[in-house]
Amino acid sequence: VLSVKSLKTTTRQVDYLTEEQMNNLINLPPIDTSTGIRHRIIMCLLYDTGARVQELCDLKIEDINLGNNPTVKLHGKGSKIRIVPISKNMNQILEVYISKFYSNIKLKNEYLIKNKNNQQMSRDGIEYIVQKYATILKNNDPSFPSKVHPHMFRHSKAMHMLAVDIPIVYIRDFLGHEDISTTMIYARADSRKKNEAINNLAPKLIEENYVDWSKDQDLLDFLNSFK
């Protein structure tokens, strides 16, 4: 029995932004230029859909369903497809973006996000854009992370969903995880939940087990002897 090695477990570090940091980052690109609009759309989609960076690169006009119940079709790992709901704000932003850049209905099979050469946006291109604006924020706010990558938008979305008590099973489906144990890294990283659980137990412990030591003079004399 002693020769059997114990199973090693590791806790993955989850890098994410607060809601305030995320809002500041997303709203940084100017919307009075085509480039600024495109950059804002990229970051809005990364956060709102929780998409992996390659899923965003592969997104086409035909994958966007706008209207009363807007959704985005993401093409994930292993050719797996998942339908993700998007917010009303994201719906409005996409309506404006598509009408401005893709008014021709024949372009349904075109990639939603393109680079300045009118080609499919690459992973490196999106990483560059995200880091560009993160660096600007960092220069103005020392507390802002110096390194921000596209996957942090996905992490941040999961953590923010967890913070408003969205069930972990729904978060798993939203992110497209096969195994819920992958999603559980966010639950383990949420210290707010841990503190909440501890604080919920605290009143009972105090109420049921609290002893007023101030009335026990012998005990007080004993404790004072250690001074």
Task: For the regions a language model picked out, list residue spans one by one.
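Conserved catalytic core of the tyrosine transesterase superfamily
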Residues: 1-227
